[in-house]
């Protein structure tokens, strides 16, 4: 049995697990903590010369105050289009079009809204955990497919290693969740 095939299973598991964690972090960055965060809007698509362009490519997004974002378009003629795209995004923020720039004012989160956000955070967390577990199952199946070529002891050893990798990524997801939950519950 060529050990490189087994190593390929482990490296694929690691790579896919890292992608799950990265996507999880990206999805969490979209959850508003009551503080202005450019991540919330940077990928909103704006119609610009009949093409849909991410907001971050056609404007400068800054945080002048903790609960405010300021969008300064590079081309002032598209301010109305940006405003329209922001309205369509249903951001739950006050949008003020000042002519050549747009301000987004984020309301302070009340306790009820914080609890709702923690619930949605928990949904994202569970989805990420399930994805990691599915990757574990996939890797275990690949290892078992070699059972005619490797011993039962080796299969158990490889499954244990897969479980260890799985546990480390679940732990990362849980840490990220705890951090985000603390941010959400901070007043």
From Swiss-Prot:
- A biological-process GO annotation: translational termination
One matching Pfam family is RRF
| Cellular-component GO terms for this entry | cytoplasm
Domain of life of the native organism: Bacteria
Q: Where in the cell is it found?
A: Cytoplasm
**Keyword set, alphabetical order:** Cytoplasm, Protein biosynthesis
Q: Which GO terms describe its molecular function?
A: ribosomal large subunit binding
Q: Which SUPFAM superfamilies does the record cross-reference, listed alphabetically?
A: Ribosome recycling factor, RRF
Q: So what family is this one in?
A: Belongs to the RRF family.
What the protein does comes down to: Responsible for the release of ribosomes from messenger RNA at the termination of protein biosynthesis. May increase the efficiency of translation by recycling ribosomes from one round of translation to another.
Give the protein name, as stated in the record: Ribosome-recycling factor
């Amino acid at each position: 049995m060529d050990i490189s095939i087994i190593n390929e299973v482990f490296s694929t598991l690691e790579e896919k697990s890292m992608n799950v964690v990265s996507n999880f972090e990206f999805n969490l960055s979209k959850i508003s903590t009551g503080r202005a965060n450019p991540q919330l809007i940077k990928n909103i698509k704006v119609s610009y010369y009949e093409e849909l362009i991410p907001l971050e490519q056609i404007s400068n997004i800054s945080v002048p105050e903790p609960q405010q974002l300021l969008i300064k378009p590079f081309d002032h003629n598209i301010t109305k289009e940006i405003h329209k795209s922001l309205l369509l995004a249903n951001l739950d923020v006050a949008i003020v079009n000042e002519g050549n720039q747009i301000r987004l004012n984020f309301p302070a989160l009340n306790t009820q809204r914080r609890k709702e956000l923690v619930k949605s955070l928990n949904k994202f967390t569970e989805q990420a955990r399930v994805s990691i577990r599915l990757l574990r199952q996939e890797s275990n199946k690949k290892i078992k497919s070699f059972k005619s070529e490797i011993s039962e002891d080796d299969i158990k050893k490889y499954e244990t290693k897969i479980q260890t990798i799985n546990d480390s990524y679940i732990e990362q997801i849980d840490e990220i969740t705890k951090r985000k939950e603390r941010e959400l519950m901070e007043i």
